Protein backbone atom coordinates (compact mmCIF):
# COMPACT_ATOMS: atom_id res chain seq x y z
CA UNK A 1 0.00 0.00 0.00
CA UNK A 2 1.33 3.40 -0.98
CA UNK A 3 1.40 5.84 1.92
CA UNK A 4 2.20 9.52 1.90
CA UNK A 5 5.36 8.94 3.93
CA UNK A 6 6.57 6.29 1.48
CA UNK A 7 6.15 8.82 -1.34
CA UNK A 8 8.18 11.38 0.61
CA UNK A 9 11.40 9.40 0.35
CA UNK A 10 13.83 12.30 -0.22
CA UNK A 11 13.95 16.07 0.23
CA UNK A 12 12.45 16.84 -3.19
CA UNK A 13 9.57 14.36 -3.05
CA UNK A 14 8.86 15.30 0.57
CA UNK A 15 8.63 18.98 -0.34
CA UNK A 16 6.27 18.12 -3.19
CA UNK A 17 4.13 16.08 -0.79
CA UNK A 18 4.02 18.94 1.70
CA UNK A 19 3.18 21.53 -0.95
CA UNK A 20 0.46 19.33 -2.45
CA UNK A 21 -1.32 18.80 0.85
CA UNK A 22 -0.65 21.83 3.06
CA UNK A 23 -1.49 25.51 2.81
CA UNK A 24 1.25 27.86 1.59
CA UNK A 25 2.77 30.51 3.87
CA UNK A 26 2.63 28.23 6.93
CA UNK A 27 5.26 29.36 9.43
CA UNK A 28 5.26 26.13 11.46
CA UNK A 29 5.86 24.04 8.34
CA UNK A 30 8.74 26.31 7.36
CA UNK A 31 10.19 26.17 10.86
CA UNK A 32 10.07 22.38 10.89
CA UNK A 33 11.68 22.06 7.46
CA UNK A 34 14.49 24.37 8.56
CA UNK A 35 15.00 22.36 11.75
CA UNK A 36 14.71 18.73 10.58
CA UNK A 37 14.24 18.73 6.80
CA UNK A 38 11.21 17.97 4.66
CA UNK A 39 11.29 14.17 5.01
CA UNK A 40 11.12 14.30 8.81
CA UNK A 41 8.53 17.11 8.64
CA UNK A 42 6.28 14.83 6.61
CA UNK A 43 6.71 12.06 9.18
CA UNK A 44 5.81 14.48 11.95
CA UNK A 45 2.71 15.56 10.04
CA UNK A 46 1.69 11.92 9.75
CA UNK A 47 1.96 11.55 13.51
CA UNK A 48 5.35 9.86 13.79
CA UNK A 49 8.10 11.11 16.09
CA UNK A 50 8.68 13.92 18.55
CA UNK A 51 8.88 17.55 17.52
CA UNK A 52 12.21 19.38 17.78
CA UNK A 53 12.65 21.74 20.72
CA UNK A 54 12.98 24.68 18.34
CA UNK A 55 9.23 24.47 17.68
CA UNK A 56 6.77 25.42 20.41
CA UNK A 57 4.95 22.29 21.59
CA UNK A 58 1.51 23.96 21.52
CA UNK A 59 2.06 25.27 17.98
CA UNK A 60 3.34 21.84 16.94
CA UNK A 61 0.31 20.04 18.35
CA UNK A 62 -2.13 22.41 16.69
CA UNK A 63 -0.22 22.08 13.41
CA UNK A 64 -0.36 18.28 13.50
CA UNK A 65 -4.07 18.27 14.32
CA UNK A 66 -4.68 20.60 11.38
CA UNK A 67 -2.58 18.87 8.73
CA UNK A 68 -2.89 15.21 9.63
CA UNK A 69 -6.47 14.80 8.26
CA UNK A 70 -5.37 16.35 4.96
CA UNK A 71 -2.60 13.87 4.23
CA UNK A 72 -3.65 11.78 1.26
CA UNK A 73 -1.24 9.81 -0.91
CA UNK A 74 -3.62 10.17 -3.85
CA UNK A 75 -3.24 13.95 -3.78
CA UNK A 76 0.54 13.64 -4.00
CA UNK A 77 0.38 10.98 -6.70
CA UNK A 78 -1.94 13.19 -8.73
CA UNK A 79 0.39 16.19 -8.33
CA UNK A 80 3.36 14.15 -9.55
CA UNK A 81 1.34 12.75 -12.45
CA UNK A 82 0.22 16.23 -13.53
CA UNK A 83 3.81 17.46 -13.25
CA UNK A 84 4.93 14.79 -15.71
CA UNK A 85 1.93 15.24 -18.00
CA UNK A 86 2.44 18.98 -18.32
CA UNK A 87 6.22 18.77 -18.57
CA UNK A 88 6.76 20.94 -15.51
CA UNK A 89 10.00 21.45 -13.61
CA UNK A 90 10.14 21.14 -9.83
CA UNK A 91 12.51 23.49 -8.04
CA UNK A 92 13.49 23.39 -4.38
CA UNK A 93 16.01 25.43 -2.37
CA UNK A 94 19.53 24.46 -3.34
CA UNK A 95 18.70 23.85 -7.00
CA UNK A 96 20.79 25.87 -9.44
CA UNK A 97 17.82 27.87 -10.71
CA UNK A 98 16.06 28.37 -7.38
CA UNK A 99 15.44 32.14 -6.95
CA UNK A 100 17.54 32.75 -3.85
CA UNK A 101 15.71 36.01 -3.09
CA UNK A 102 12.83 33.82 -1.85
CA UNK A 103 15.06 32.67 0.99
CA UNK A 104 14.61 36.13 2.51
CA UNK A 105 11.07 35.03 3.39
CA UNK A 106 12.56 32.64 5.93
CA UNK A 107 10.07 30.16 7.36
CA UNK A 108 7.38 31.48 5.02
CA UNK A 109 9.33 30.81 1.82
CA UNK A 110 7.65 28.51 -0.72
CA UNK A 111 8.21 24.82 -0.08
CA UNK A 112 8.60 24.13 -3.79
CA UNK A 113 8.07 25.87 -7.13
CA UNK A 114 6.47 24.34 -10.19
CA UNK A 115 7.87 25.93 -13.33
CA UNK A 116 6.86 25.70 -16.97
CA UNK A 117 9.24 26.85 -19.68
CA UNK A 118 12.73 28.27 -19.19
CA UNK A 119 13.72 27.90 -15.55
CA UNK A 120 16.95 29.91 -15.79
CA UNK A 121 14.95 33.17 -15.76
CA UNK A 122 14.24 32.53 -12.09
CA UNK A 123 17.89 32.66 -11.06
CA UNK A 124 18.59 35.95 -12.83
CA UNK A 125 19.73 38.73 -10.52
CA UNK A 126 17.00 40.92 -9.08
CA UNK A 127 18.31 43.92 -11.01
CA UNK A 128 17.60 42.05 -14.26
CA UNK A 129 13.92 41.59 -13.41
CA UNK A 130 11.17 44.19 -13.22
CA UNK A 131 7.67 43.50 -11.94
CA UNK A 132 4.74 45.24 -13.59
CA UNK A 133 1.23 44.84 -12.23
CA UNK A 134 -1.96 46.82 -12.12
CA UNK A 135 -5.70 46.88 -12.61
CA UNK A 136 -7.54 44.18 -14.50
CA UNK A 137 -10.09 46.70 -15.72
CA UNK A 138 -7.37 48.93 -17.13
CA UNK A 139 -8.02 51.91 -19.36
CA UNK A 140 -6.68 51.96 -22.90
CA UNK A 141 -4.27 54.68 -21.79
CA UNK A 142 -3.05 52.52 -18.91
CA UNK A 143 -2.41 49.60 -21.24
CA UNK A 144 -0.63 51.90 -23.71
CA UNK A 145 1.72 53.27 -21.05
CA UNK A 146 2.32 49.75 -19.74
CA UNK A 147 3.22 48.61 -23.23
CA UNK A 148 5.71 51.43 -23.69
CA UNK A 149 7.30 50.78 -20.31
CA UNK A 150 7.56 47.02 -20.83
CA UNK A 151 8.94 47.48 -24.33
CA UNK A 152 11.61 49.93 -23.15
CA UNK A 153 12.63 47.62 -20.31
CA UNK A 154 12.79 44.66 -22.67
CA UNK A 155 15.09 46.50 -25.04
CA UNK A 156 17.25 47.31 -22.01
CA UNK A 157 17.63 43.58 -21.38
CA UNK A 158 15.25 43.28 -18.44
CA UNK A 159 12.97 40.30 -17.75
CA UNK A 160 9.36 41.36 -17.17
CA UNK A 161 7.55 39.70 -14.27
CA UNK A 162 3.76 39.92 -14.04
CA UNK A 163 0.69 37.91 -13.18
CA UNK A 164 -1.56 36.36 -15.77
CA UNK A 165 -4.59 38.61 -15.34
CA UNK A 166 -6.38 40.72 -17.91
CA UNK A 167 -5.49 44.39 -18.14
CA UNK A 168 -2.07 45.66 -17.10
CA UNK A 169 -0.51 42.23 -16.50
CA UNK A 170 -1.43 40.95 -19.96
CA UNK A 171 -0.36 44.21 -21.60
CA UNK A 172 3.07 43.91 -19.98
CA UNK A 173 3.56 40.36 -21.26
CA UNK A 174 2.42 41.20 -24.79
CA UNK A 175 4.66 44.24 -25.08
CA UNK A 176 7.70 42.35 -23.79
CA UNK A 177 7.13 39.28 -25.96
CA UNK A 178 6.52 41.25 -29.17
CA UNK A 179 10.22 42.10 -29.75
CA UNK A 180 11.33 38.66 -28.52
CA UNK A 181 11.77 39.60 -24.88
CA UNK A 182 11.56 37.39 -21.83
CA UNK A 183 8.75 37.32 -19.28
CA UNK A 184 7.85 35.42 -16.14
CA UNK A 185 4.18 34.85 -15.37
CA UNK A 186 3.34 34.15 -11.74
CA UNK A 187 0.30 31.87 -11.74
CA UNK A 188 -1.46 31.90 -8.40
CA UNK A 189 -4.01 29.26 -9.44
CA UNK A 190 -1.42 26.74 -10.57
CA UNK A 191 0.02 25.65 -13.90
CA UNK A 192 -2.50 22.88 -14.48
CA UNK A 193 -5.32 25.36 -15.08
CA UNK A 194 -4.15 28.60 -16.64
CA UNK A 195 -6.35 31.48 -15.52
CA UNK A 196 -8.01 33.48 -16.86
CA UNK A 197 -8.88 31.18 -19.74
CA UNK A 198 -9.11 34.17 -22.07
CA UNK A 199 -5.34 34.63 -21.68
CA UNK A 200 -4.50 30.96 -22.27
CA UNK A 201 -2.88 31.57 -25.66
CA UNK A 202 -0.75 34.37 -24.21
CA UNK A 203 0.28 32.32 -21.19
CA UNK A 204 1.15 29.24 -23.21
Which residues does each predicted region cover?
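Short, small/acidic-rich helices and loops at N termini and domain boundaries
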Residues: 1-97
Amino acid sequence: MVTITSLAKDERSARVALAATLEPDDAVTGRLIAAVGAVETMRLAAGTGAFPKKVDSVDAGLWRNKVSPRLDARTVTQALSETDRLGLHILIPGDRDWPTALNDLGERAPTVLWVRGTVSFLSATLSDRVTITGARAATSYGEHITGELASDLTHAGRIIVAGGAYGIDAAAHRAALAPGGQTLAVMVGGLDRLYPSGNRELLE
